[in-house]
Amino acid sequence: MNHPDIARRVYNHTWKLDPIIRSLLDTDFYKLLMVQMIWGLYPTVNVTFSLINRTKTIRLADDIDESELRAQLDHALSLRFTKKEMIWLAGNTFYGRKQIFEPDFLQWLENFQLPEYELARKDGQYILHFHGSWAHSSMWEIPALAIISELRSRAALKKLDRFALDVLYARAKAKMWRKVERLKKLPDIKISDFGTRRRHSFLWQRWCVEALKEGIGDSFTGTSNVLLAMDTDLEALGTNAHELPMVIAALSNNDDELRRAPYQVLQDWNRYYGGNLLIVLPDTFGTEAFLCDAPDWVADWTGFRPDSAPPIEGGERIIQWWKEKGQDPREKLLIFSDALDVDTIEKTYHHFHGKVRMSFGWGTDLTNDFTGCAPQEIATLDALSLVCKVTHANGRPAVKLSDNPEKTIGDSKEVQRYLNFFGNKKRVARPVKM
């Protein structure tokens, strides 16, 4: 792969539109896995995805020009999967399995285009919604977040001259490489790139991926970014997301259906995928509630991805549950991916080494850590906590409780109903990093 001079490219930025999203594969792999299942099992469900800025102090609409945002969103609307991309999806092996994508789904994907968006401004924030069929609207989440994150980076970089840009990227590369050198000291560690949605830029994410390939070799297991996986001959990695139980729960018609919703999702998933893709995401309505009611067969799955509790605390709770179910944790897998930095990775690795198989999905701290790199302080270079979540399904409000109340999403009355139903046990408020 060619290694462009990122600073020069930023400085020579004179064209009318430099597309941030150049391919529909510039997304997380689990989106394609989920969308195939959604397309097959829930073709008539309509949803709304909404942008949510959890960093309330940042007035996003003041940082990003609306016309530039619309231009980037409009460009994404024009994209289609290319013949080369379709051949790769059809012929590549994912998670050791050929033809993971069914021919009928690939035929549907050939004609896929993103649905229209709704954009407005209010009190310094952007109000951005995506409506439509679940299979279509879901595909907006990652490109929308990547567009906004990179536009904010570009706005910050406009304040720097060519020399300052050289300094910025030289420092950022050195900072990144120091992290790589620390990770090299952890034997048998498994690290993957989960940094697409809040990246500084596509080019920077690509450089970080190349740095990990060079620096830690086989310990770098792959990337969630499908386009980068294709272009760099890496494994495309990903499991499933909170949107699945959020939507199924929103569609429930009674308490019994609501209680079964998180496990119905797993049964659906098992119809399509197996092996290392059998990873449980337990915290949508609180991990404690999930484990309390989980059927015994859930313990037979490959592993868990504890997402919103502190990694050591969350991992220990799952290990305890496995033992209660007669499972050997040393044969199970924990995937840690929530707001990881190198300090957290090191601490978690040392705590669990020899107790359980581990993998780390490294996100924003990998692809958007420019703090202290600019010759002068530029606050808009700092990453912010931005999400794009499903908020309605067939007109009904969708809810995410999480193990951290600060990450709760949904209409306040509906959130309270879910809390009354699932309980509030072991949910502890903590500052949200990313």
UniProtKB/Swiss-Prot annotation:
Annotated metabolic or biological route of this protein: Cofactor biosynthesis; NAD(+) biosynthesis; nicotinate D-ribonucleotide from nicotinate: step 1/1
Question: Which biological process annotations from GO are given for this protein?
Answer: NAD biosynthetic process via the salvage pathway
The record describes its post-translational modification as: Transiently phosphorylated on a His residue during the reaction cycle. Phosphorylation strongly increases the affinity for substrates and increases the rate of nicotinate D-ribonucleotide production. Dephosphorylation regenerates the low-affinity form of the enzyme, leading to product release.
* Catalyzed chemical reaction(s): nicotinate + 5-phospho-alpha-D-ribose 1-diphosphate + ATP + H2O = nicotinate beta-D-ribonucleotide + ADP + phosphate + diphosphate
User: What would be an example GO MF term here?
Assistant: nicotinate phosphoribosyltransferase activity
Q: Which Pfam families has this protein been placed in?
A: NAPRTase (PF04095), NAPRTase_N (PF17767)
| Entry GO terms, CC | cytosol
Where, if anywhere, are coiled coils annotated? none
The cross-references to SUPFAM superfamilies, in alphabetical order and at most eight, read:
Nicotinate/Quinolinate PRTase C-terminal domain-like, Nicotinate/Quinolinate PRTase N-terminal domain-like
Q: Which sequence positions carry the modification called Phosphohistidine? A: 242
**Transmembrane region positions?**
none
Give its E.C. classification number. 6.3.4.21
Q: What class of enzyme is it?
A: ligase
Q: Which UniProt keywords apply?
A: Ligase, Phosphoprotein, Pyridine nucleotide biosynthesis
Similarity comment: family membership? Belongs to the NAPRTase family.
Q: Which PANTHER family match?
A: NICOTINATE PHOSPHORIBOSYLTRANSFERASE (PTHR11098:SF1)
Biological role stated in the UniProt entry:
Catalyzes the synthesis of beta-nicotinate D-ribonucleotide from nicotinate and 5-phospho-D-ribose 1-phosphate at the expense of ATP.
Protein name listed in UniProt: Nicotinate phosphoribosyltransferase
What organism does the record attribute this protein to? Answer: Bartonella tribocorum (strain CIP 105476 / IBS 506)
What's the encoding gene here?
pncB
